[in-house]
Amino acid sequence: MKVSVAALSCLMLVAVLGSQAQFTNDAETELMMSKLPLENPVVLNSFHFAADCCTSYISQSIPCSLMKSYFETSSECSKPGVIFLTKKGRQVCAKPSGPGVQDCMKKLKPYSI
């Protein structure tokens, strides 16, 4: 039990420090991205976890120029979704039928193993 608590504590510390280490050189882009429903990246070693489900969707059009790849959520998720990975390493959840989602998916490469 103590080992699992220690391991969980270490993982949480790494997650917090990792998110603090991100450097932003474009304040305008960061401000725009801060208004999007973002999730912390949970893709590790090319595996998708149950946490890779969308709980909410972005309401505006996907800014494709700020994205580097995407993947569709698992059929085990309660809502269908497309998770876009930003160039800054964050995730944005989008409704598959949302504005610009299909166009953006055509322009970007899917996240691959």
Curated annotation (Swiss-Prot):
One of its GO terms (biological process) is antimicrobial humoral immune response mediated by antimicrobial peptide. Disulfide bonds join 53-77, 54-93, 64-104. InterPro entries: Chemokine_b/g/d (IPR039809), Chemokine_CC_CS (IPR000827), Chemokine_IL8-like_dom (IPR001811), Interleukin_8-like_sf (IPR036048). GO terms for molecular function: CCR chemokine receptor binding; chemoattractant activity; chemokine activity; heparin binding; signaling receptor binding. The N-terminal is proteolytically cleaved by proteases associated with inflammatory responses. The processed forms CCL15(22-92), CCL15(25-92) and CCL15(29-92) exhibit increase in CCR1-mediated signaling and chemotaxis assays in vitro. Keywords: Chemotaxis, Cytokine, Disulfide bond, Heparin-binding, Secreted, Signal. Its main location: secreted. Pfam families: IL8 (PF00048). Gene3D superfamilies: 2.40.50.40. Belongs to the intercrine beta (chemokine CC) family. This is C-C motif chemokine 15. It comes from Homo sapiens.
